[in-house]
Amino acid sequence: MPKQSVEYSAGYDLYVPFDTVIKRGRQAVPIGIKVGVPKGIDGHIRPRSGFSIKGMEGYTIPRFKWLKPKLKRFDADVIEGTVDCGYRDEINVIINNHDKPFTIEGGTRIAQIVFNKHELPVLMETDELKGFDRGGGLGHTGTK
């Protein structure tokens, strides 16, 4: 079951329910829970900040059975995702592994989900935008 790690956390931690091998590349990792998100709410799956900066914690997969797996950090990232209102199925967390395959131990917190209220504006096609003259984007105002 997802939990807040501290009382004022914005979201709930998502746990891997059992030992899971993470292969190189993108992979959907089942979390073992189903959700029913009500109308007007969405869930935003986010990486945990510690994994984002330090790498994802897991165990090496030894080439030989007599070698013991070693705990280390791997270059793997959680890809952000949205759980739409009305969704009624199991949550998966997408991991992009840029490293060697590794095993995440069952019970490891790998991501978090934050729920938000949302509104959908009515979109209209137009040839002219009125209001602020604000263009550019992507850093057009500089850094200082």
What does each model-identified segment do?
Residues 1-144:
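DUTPase catalytic domain/fold
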